[in-house]
Amino acid sequence: MPGPTPDSSRDVRPTLEAVAALAGVSRATASRVVNGGAGVRKPLVEQVRKAVDELGYVPNHAARTLVTRRNGAVAVIIDEPEFRIFSDPFFSQQIRGISRELSVYDAQLVLLLVEGSGDFDRVARYLAGGHVDGALAFSLHMDDELPSIIRRFRVPTVYGGRPGRPGAASEPALPYVDCDNRGGAAEAVRHLVSLGRRRIAHIAGPRDQTSALDRIDGYRDVLPEGDPALLAEGDFTVEGGARAMTQLLERHPDLDAVFAANDLMASGALRVLRERGRRVPKEVALVGFDDMVSIAEITEPPLTTVRQDVEGMGRLMVRMLMRRLNGEGEGDELESVITPTRLVHRASA
Amino acid sequence: MPGPTPDSSRDVRPTLEAVAALAGVSRATASRVVNGGAGVRKPLVEQVRKAVDELGYVPNHAARTLVTRRNGAVAVIIDEPEFRIFSDPFFSQQIRGISRELSVYDAQLVLLLVEGSGDFDRVARYLAGGHVDGALAFSLHMDDELPSIIRRFRVPTVYGGRPGRPGAASEPALPYVDCDNRGGAAEAVRHLVSLGRRRIAHIAGPRDQTSALDRIDGYRDVLPEGDPALLAEGDFTVEGGARAMTQLLERHPDLDAVFAANDLMASGALRVLRERGRRVPKEVALVGFDDMVSIAEITEPPLTTVRQDVEGMGRLMVRMLMRRLNGEGEGDELESVITPTRLVHRASA
């Protein structure tokens, strides 16, 4: 990325010396005022502030960070391409919780967008630059470099979702917030069993994410002897859910229930079932995961699904990070939190 | 926002001296390597890099910026609450264009989210901290403080949409990218006139945004003698469009066409027309603005609308900013760009 020419005279920023000169005070006094220091008489404070405003003086960033180590900013990093972040309501709900809770702490939310994992070099440079006090990272994949980048630059971080690689035995666990993926999935499948369904399929998420693996485990907890052909893998998108549903109907035309690992895939599955003339829930009962109200309440029929408190989890991540930044326990000692899930009954199952 | 206790020994970052000592080189040599400088023999470069990795050394941010004044990062600031940014496809399209083009320049997109205009103090502090090389700002409102904040901290900036307050006569104009709001609106209304429609209503956007005002002007250009009761104000949301349509039908039950200032409001208007049993386009013809494909192609009937190249405008904003950062003309001299619009014919008019 190009920068301005170094000798560009029009781009020279005013110095603290210029502020002091304009205010008619010593450099030390000007410095104390700029750094919010006490011990300066009020009229002098006002003179200096006026000079700062007049000159458009910008305090030296690093000098301030050395004193307080506070940028008043927290990075949010999501390992998904920008278009998924804006099309999957899961991310907007989580960001909503984070944004609202950061406001409470008067901290600026800095969302670092990437086009793909290849862009993490750039994210690493930004984190290395010391522009943020901490980070919240989510949607990690198994082969994700982010935890090692974060560890290398010693950025206090809380993860959303259990990270896939806990690291070598010598490395401490990473602090995270996650919902009870396994327990919630098991509850969904038990509900389908209780309705008398016998051929219960599962549309799983991508196997490089722990949330998908844990939900498969919950499905298997209830159906340990289930036919492996009743399990198809989607990618947490509407289209992925539709593709998986098509495969499942080809392999098992007699299936009578589907548990999809998120609501987006459930809505894709629902479309395929409707196109094939399968009545939901009469012929095929369907349960999703997430309880994204913007999806689950508008599908026809509305979706029975496993609710997780996505916004609340975002808020919790912020509070954990703030405790860490407050010096209350290192990240290494910060306890991870698993939040409960709850089956929400609607018409689809 | 709380920071770690200053004397927290576990939080001490490794110094350049420690890197030099571990690598067995002088501090000057270590500094040259860290700053990417030439003139250091390759084996020494490798020794220093190894020490940097081992210690997790983070280069002093300000020292680097003083040399190059490049953070490799650009802020994107949108004066809308976070929930609107994630629910209005206009913003995701613009961010998509910006994200892709910034990738070309290997610059990190830093999206600064706010809950409301009250949060601009915090954004100002972040900009003042010198964490970004420049900014892209959009969705400004008339009373927006953002331009004055940006001017004060001398952050090179390109605006998306013509800013509402060009500033005092002594202040130079702000560089912006916008579409031909007025010309596009006039084309939409001329199309409705050409279909023989005589009572053409307009659902306008909020009057504190120039895009809304310019589209009203385009409507008036074609219908200078139109009944003022045929104009209702929405807020660029689906619900706002529905409310405005309800008002218009109460005031003018005989209206035979509607031009809505964006597609979201057009889809809300369409819902109300359907609920009232008005056939579109037979009884009421409807034209939107934006051509958000995710809306205009899925409404029933599909929406005739004024297309603006939102993603392309985002890309253009990045290229203009990069020219500025390259020293090719100051912001004051950078020419603003108005991009053309085009009427896209679908079934609704």
Question: Where would I find each of the regions flagged by the language model?
Answer:
Chain A
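Alpha-helical recognition/docking segments in bacterial nutrient-uptake
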Residues: 1-11, 73-190, 250
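Hinge/beta->alpha junction and helix N-cap segments in small-molecule ligand-binding domains
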Residues: 80-93, 111-119, 176-187, 203-246, ...
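N-terminal helix-turn-helix DNA-binding module of bacterial transcription factors
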Residues: 1-72
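Short acidic capping loops at alpha-helix termini that bridge into adjacent secondary structure
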Residues: 199-200, 226-229, 280-286
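Flexible loop/turn connectors
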Residues: 251-349
